[in-house]
């Protein structure tokens, strides 16, 4: 391991409005012989979460105007298409979006690079399942053997990207209601802290009746709650962190162009014709 320290005079700070990037060329010599070289693109910015105040970027308070963005590209499929990703991000930028949550998997490097360039803050998410199954063929079958390896690879791969402002260790994992769930959360969060002490860690929690009382939410650096916005105040007052993150607050489940009239209050607005009303 080689450690270097250097000074950048009058740096241009990275932000969604000014996504300034730098390039570091690293060359290692043994005598006059080059043994290795590497090019790292990076940005300069500060970030912190202040108890009782919220998230700060470059010393200024900031709210996330974000989306939970799944890795597929609609009819184009899940294979990486840089042009399609750029087009998608440009449309999000036009509508005022400045943050991306990689729902609910580790992102392609191309997406993170584009977020660096276009100016999106990222919550990079690792897992949709831990050691307790959501489905029979899920990641729980590999968790014990691969969880730490996968987390280490994710953090090391993206820790130099300025767009990444937070790590997420999971989404709506059934383990959150297990009596030992907080230990698994602490295990994964500790890996993030060990590999990258500069960023905070969250998890998308959707079982507040469990996590507010079993120690799970109390473990997290940042308390991420999916939906249940009516419980934000209770969670904020109950937990010691002094912060709440709306990690997932709305779902665009509807059939395009379908509007059922008269409008009725209906869970997910599902009807017998298998359509979902956009109202």
What is the role of each PLM region?
Residues 1-122, 150-160, 165-166, 183-185, ...:
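Secreted/periplasmic carbohydrate-active enzymes, especially glycoside hydrolases
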Residues 89-92, 98-279:
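Substrate-binding/catalytic cleft of secreted carbohydrate-active enzymes
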């Amino acid at each position: 391991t080689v450690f270097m320290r250097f000074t950048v005079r009058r740096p241009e700070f990275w932000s969604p409005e000014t996504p300034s990037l730098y390039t570091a060329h690293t060359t290692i010599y043994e005598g006059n012989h080059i043994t290795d070289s590497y090019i790292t693109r990076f940005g300069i910015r500060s970030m912190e979460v202040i108890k009782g105040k919220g998230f700060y970027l470059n010393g200024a308070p900031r709210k996330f105007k974000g989306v939970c963005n799944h890795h597929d590209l609609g009819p184009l499929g899940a294979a990486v298409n840089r042009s399609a990703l750029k087009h998608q991000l440009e449309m999000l930028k036009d509508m005022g979006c400045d943050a991306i949550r990689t729902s609910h998997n580790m992102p392609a490097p191309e997406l993170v690079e584009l977020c660096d360039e276009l100016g999106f803050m990222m919550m990079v998410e690792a897992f949709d399942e831990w050691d307790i199954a959501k489905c029979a063929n899920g990641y729980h079958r590999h968790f014990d053997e691969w969880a730490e390896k996968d987390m280490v690879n994710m953090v090391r791969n993206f820790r130099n990207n300025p767009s990444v402002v937070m790590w997420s260790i999971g989404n709506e994992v059934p383990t959150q209601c297990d009596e030992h769930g907080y230990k698994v959360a602490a295990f994964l969060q500790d890996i993030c802290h060990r590999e990258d002490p500069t960023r905070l860690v969250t998890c998308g929690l959707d079982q507040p009746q469990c996590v507010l009382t079993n120690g799970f939410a109390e473990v997290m650096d940042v308390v991420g709650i999916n939906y249940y916005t009516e419980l934000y105040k209770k969670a904020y007052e109950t937990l010691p962190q002094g912060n709440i993150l709306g990690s997932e607050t709305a779902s665009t489940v509807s059939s395009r162009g379908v509007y059922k009239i008269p409008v009725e209050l209906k869970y997910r607005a599902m009807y017998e014709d298998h359509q979902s009303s956009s109202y």
